[in-house]
C-alpha cells in the first residue's frame, strides 16, 4: 500500500515521501480501516520538525498522520463494537500514528462511528481537536454553571471548543476578529469580544477557567482575568522558569 512518510526531521522544509509498504495485519482487538480521509494539523508539522521526539522518539521512516476516517475492512476476533462496512473516525495513538496511508490497523477503542451528517473530510477535522479540548476541560475540572474564557474563538480550535464547553453547561466568553462575531455567537458563545475594539483584560475578570489557544504574551494576560483558584490550560504556551517567576508561581508547578 502507499503511505506518506517522514524520513528525516527538518525544521525548515517539511517533506513527506510517498512509498510502498506492506498492508498492516491486525490483532484480536484491532480494526483494519481503509482510509478515505485524513486530517492535517499543527501536530503533524511539529512531528515533522522533530519537536516531539523527546516525548515520542519515532523510529524513522515513520508514516505520518494523526486523524483518520475510513471504512472498516476487517475486525479482530475480540472486537464487538464495529462491523465490516462501518464508517469510522479516530485520533490514532501518539505512539502508533500513520493516517497518511491507504490502510491503518487501529485498536477498536480508539475509533467511533462517523455521524451521518458529517462528510469524510469534515469528520477528519474532528478527532484530535475535539479530544484535546475534552482533555483540557477535564484537566480544569470544569463544572457546569461556571464561566470559561476561550481565547481565539474565531479560530479552528476555538470554534470547536465553544460548542463542547456549552454542552458541558459552561458560560462561554471568547474573543477574536469582529467580522466573525455572528458565527461565533451562533456556535453558542454567551459573550463575544472584538479584540480590535475591546481589551478583555479591562472588561473581563473573575472567570473560573481559561482555555488558551494562542500562547505567547496572551497566556500571561489571560492569567490576570481568572479568579483566585481558577484554572488555565494552554494549548500553545511552553511554561519555563522565567514564566513562573513573572507569574509568582513555583517552578515545579
Language-model-detected regions and their locations in the chain:
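Glycine-rich beta-strand-centered segment in the early N-terminal region that forms part
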Residues: 22-40, 52-95
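NAD(P)H dinucleotide-binding glycine-rich loop of Rossmann-like/cofactor-binding domains
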Residues: 57, 74, 90-152
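Short glycine/proline-centered loop/turn elements that form peptide/ligand docking sites
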Residues: 76-78, 174-183, 216-218, 240
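Mid-domain Rossmann-like dinucleotide-binding core that forms the NAD(H)/NADP(H) cofactor-binding site
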Residues: 124-194
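A short acidic, Gly/Pro-enriched loop at the edge of an enzyme's catalytic core
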Residues: 202-209
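Glycine-rich phosphate-binding loop and adjacent beta-alpha segment
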Residues: 217-253
